[in-house]
Swiss-Prot record:
GO terms for cellular component: glutamyl-tRNA(Gln) amidotransferase complex. Keywords: ATP-binding, Ligase, Nucleotide-binding, Protein biosynthesis. One of its GO terms (biological process) is translation. The active site is at 53 (charge relay system), 128 (charge relay system), 152 (acyl-ester intermediate). This is Glutamyl-tRNA(Gln) amidotransferase subunit A. GO terms for molecular function: ATP binding; glutaminyl-tRNA synthase (glutamine-hydrolyzing) activity. HAMAP family: GatA (MF_00120). It catalyses: L-glutamyl-tRNA(Gln) + L-glutamine + ATP + H2O = L-glutaminyl-tRNA(Gln) + L-glutamate + ADP + phosphate + H(+). Its EC number is 6.3.5.7. Allows the formation of correctly charged Gln-tRNA(Gln) through the transamidation of misacylated Glu-tRNA(Gln) in organisms which lack glutaminyl-tRNA synthetase. The reaction takes place in the presence of glutamine and ATP through an activated gamma-phospho-Glu-tRNA(Gln). It comes from Helicobacter pylori (strain HPAG1). Heterotrimer of A, B and C subunits. PROSITE patterns: AMIDASES.
Amino acid sequence: MITLKQALSLSQDELETLKNEIDAKVRASDLNAYIKAPSLNGASAKGVPILIKDNISVKGWEVTCSSKILEGYVAPYHASVIENLHQNSMAGFGLSNMDEFAMGSTTESSCYGITKNPRDKNRVPGGSSGGSAAAVAGGLAVAALGSDTGGSIRQPASYCGCVGLKPTYGRVSRYGLIAYCSSFDQIGPITQNVEDASILFDAISGHDNKDSTSANLKPTQTFKNLNRDKRFKIAILRDHIKDASNEVQLAYENTLKALKEMGHEIVEKKMLDSHYQISIYYIISMAEASSNLARFDGVRYGRRAQNIKDLKELYLKSRSEGFGDEVKRRIMLGNFVLSSGYYDAYYLKAQQMRLIIKEQYNKIFEEVDLIFTPVAPTSAHLFNYHASPLEMYLSDIYTIGANLSGLPALSLPVAKDPLGLPIGMQFIAKAFDEQSLLDVSYALEQELDLKLD
């Protein structure tokens, strides 16, 4: 597939040809990365075609978060990131499959069916932005937008062999993103390489008056300032990699060796055990989800239950029929931790621990420029691999820290396991220092020159 950098130099006629080629590929593909062929969404704006995750509003398109409960909901306005794309010669072209309401790590909970990993169709693409990552890796998209609540851009990028960037919280507007956990959610790019990630990130970043959490900063210029010659002081968290598979640990050590040979300084640091972070993350995210998803009741928009007797039954049936099992589980657990008698014991304590985690990251970043970790404990696993929801939640063990602390993080493919499946590693930077993330990743990408095909 042509890169985003290359596509931006095409004429309008050439872009129309490219869109037709992508549409034909999607129709012929069995990956199920797109919800439907892009042409079925209606006419798209002029510009380089960018795949959009199915929780980002595109005016006139049916946007469902891959859930039955939003069946038939047509977005009445553009998300701010879509308007930003239009201002930078890009446009939405198709919606990608995802875990329902972004609650999952495998893209198996979508009402549209599973998405397959293009590297091995018997394996998951990761999630929740699995459709976006599978499309980019499978040659079905120039680039894509995803959302990241606890690793939902970075983990599928690692599983599929793409570059995935979660910007600093507040760097990219969330206006028009259908919320899962408002204090963690962030929109970001999934691309074929670091240059493309930089270009797409620059296009969607910047202050937005329509988002009260948007940082009052100008759009970034990371692509213009990309520098592969900078050297950084990089922290590693040895205690945190003990849960990784042997293949991931080997890739981690080999990448560390490459970073040292490139002239970067590596230092060891310690912080709160990552298993505590998992508990904190899920308590807060489920609590916010139970509140955010209360609006989907069958009254104002989306799916409405039929043959009901009264308002109570309308609510009950619409939500029971419309939400999948994982979403119901998180809503119930979220309501539990917010309930009387448990609020202080769970939710309040989790928020207090979140502040401690932020302080620990800030303390580390007083001495270093970046933190280096794996993205996931394993490479992509087979479908129906997890024996329980708790096992699935543990797959986020390396990514949630950046969401808890609002920091930027980037997933870069660095190796292949014995089966040829990609393995990604993650850099985390100080707040609003995406430039360092992209610089070190750009240099490492050039150094490793990993061939996945």
